[in-house]
Amino acid sequence: LFPENFSAQIRLADWYYIQGMLDESLITYEVAENLDSGNPVVQARLGRIYADKNQNKKAQAALEKAIKLNSKDAESHYQLGKLVSSEEKWGRAQSLLSNAIALDAKQAAFHYELGKVLLGRGNIELAQEKFKTALGLEPQNSNFIMGLALALVEKKNLDQALNILLPVSKKEAKNSEIFMAICNVYTKKGYFTAATGYCEKSLELKAGNYETMNRLAWLYAKKSSNLPKAFELSSQTLKAFPSRPEFIDTLSEILYVQGESDKAMAKIQEAINLVPNNPYYKQQLWKFKNVKPKPPA
């Protein structure tokens, strides 16, 4: 194979990419880029690989270039929109994803990603419409169903959210995310026993998921049950993410329930220091100071 054979480089790089050999694919695309840096296909694919390798700055630069070279490239608008959305730059993400849809409205994933952005911006009605559009194109896609459920939860339509999530959990009994989504809805309803069961199932399917571990520890604390396990889970999450206020809050709740109010107050103060304007954490501090915990069941 001669490196100067541009189309052969592209074919080889594509083959590596399809096989999941990202490093080899990247090297081959970089050779292709040296041969023709103004080729929009090369830039688009470099962007995709950098994104898959979590090299977001490089991915964004390549995708920006791809869009400049070919403004009709819907996929690059979508990929860049997704990356920008992950940084919560909602305005730019909305613009990019809207462009992607204008260029190719039949891609369900484009509508789904835009739905997530609209949800992030607090535009619940429009987000719900986008999730419905995505589901109209791919009715069985569980991610799209979870997206719609999130919008329903924001609208306080908790029973409707459960009605669409529960059937998926029967069909996709190994999908940890569905069980976690159901756990979150039951938590919102205040049905902590049901929520705990779904959260335990989710963690069983995907051990080591810190969000799930934190939620389960919090549920145990709320039920004043299984507190040693709650403390163990919470400690693990904080070891991995010592500055996550919601993880700090969980440990403070466990300490409070265990009757260690002074430690709980010191711990929740850490969360308040990180997000001084959060009213919930201030409310927690007041509770720890003024309300005696119920003795554990």
Where are these regions (language model features)?
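Canonical positions in the second alpha-helix
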Residues: L1, V31-A32, K65-A66, N99-A100, ...
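Structural marker of alpha-solenoid helical repeat scaffolds
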Residues: L1-F2, L35, L69, L103, ...
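Helix-start (N-cap) detector for alpha-helical repeat units in TPR-like alpha-solenoids
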Residues: F6-S7, P40-V41, A74-E75, A108-A109, ...
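Residue-level recognition of tetratricopeptide repeat
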Residues: D14, R48, K82, K116, ...
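Register position in tetratricopeptide repeats
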Residues: I18-Q19, D52-K53, S86-E87, G120-R121, ...
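Alpha-helical adaptor scaffolds
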Residues: N184, Y210-F241, E246, E253
